[in-house]
Amino acid sequence: MTNSSSRSVRAGSVVRTVCRHRGGRSAMVQDMVAAEMPVAFIYNGVQFAVMMATPEDLEDFALGFSLSEGIVDHAQDLRVIAVETFLEGASLQIDIPPERAAALDQRRRNLDGRSGCGVCGNESIEAVLRVPPVLNSSLQIDVDALAHALDALHARQPIAAQTGAVHAAGWADAQGNVQLVREDVGRHNALDKLIGALARARIDASQGFAVVTSRASYEMAMKATQARIPLLAAISAPTALAISLADSAGLTLIGFARNHDCVVYSHPQRLNLGVAVGETA
């Protein structure tokens, strides 16, 4: 993968004048709100999708989306990424091998107006509900490592701290040390950006785990599995379909991960709780 150009990269938050009403009083004040704009994914000169996203880390977004959607299998399959931002949006110019572009033509559709998508361009139920290769990672972490990663994730969300309007996705090593965090208005986008950042940094995603500040939908579980991340922990609940996918794909799926509490929905062998299942700590 090579980067061709990146122009006018914007901040993830903007200042707006608002009327704030508190304690029976109102005042006009300056406030920070999350930035959101349409981002067009253009492969070999042809537009594939338009996503509503936070205009930060767009190179990571381009790579992570391409990997998690199965458009390419490896980072090196992306030959050029050009990021162009303008007043009303941004475009990601992405070059992929001709055979990949031909396959993409079968999936092409415009997805304008969505804040993230994990099933983009699929035209059949079978294509959406595909089962990715099974994860065979031997990763094991302690519940303390998970709690440590959750604390670190909370502390590394500058846009969320300013605006309260974005999701975050982070990757931690087996000891719970968070290495990378990405934020976005769309939970799928945040995970895509994280996947792209991992690939750009040449970090082996299978040697750690992901934590997200959202629910764990089917699309989130699919993206984690596509990226070979063996454990996905969400602060909210998973869906039934996400659990089914995780169970069949070998993904450890955790929900309601807060402090030292959590619910493990699939493949619990990767999380050392310090007590045997059925015992009281």
UniProtKB/Swiss-Prot annotation:
What is the superkingdom listed in this entry's lineage?
Answer: Bacteria
Compartments where found: Cytoplasm
In terms of Pfam families, this protein maps to: FdhD-NarQ (PF02634)
Q: Which BP terms does GO give this entry?
A: Mo-molybdopterin cofactor biosynthetic process
Q: Taking the first listed entry, what is the main subcellular location of this protein, grouped into a coarse class?
A: cytoplasm
Give any Gene Ontology cellular component: cytoplasm
* Family annotation (InterPro entries): Cytidine_deaminase-like (IPR016193), FdhD (IPR003786)
One MF term from GO for this chain? sulfur carrier activity
- Entry-linked NCBIfam families: fdhD_narQ
The record's PANTHER family line, in alphabetical order, gives:
FORMATE DEHYDROGENASE, SULFUR CARRIER PROTEIN FDHD
Summarizing the function annotation, the protein's role is: Required for formate dehydrogenase (FDH) activity. Acts as a sulfur carrier protein that transfers sulfur from IscS to the molybdenum cofactor prior to its insertion into FDH.
What protein does this entry describe?
Sulfur carrier protein FdhD
Gene giving rise to this polypeptide: fdhD
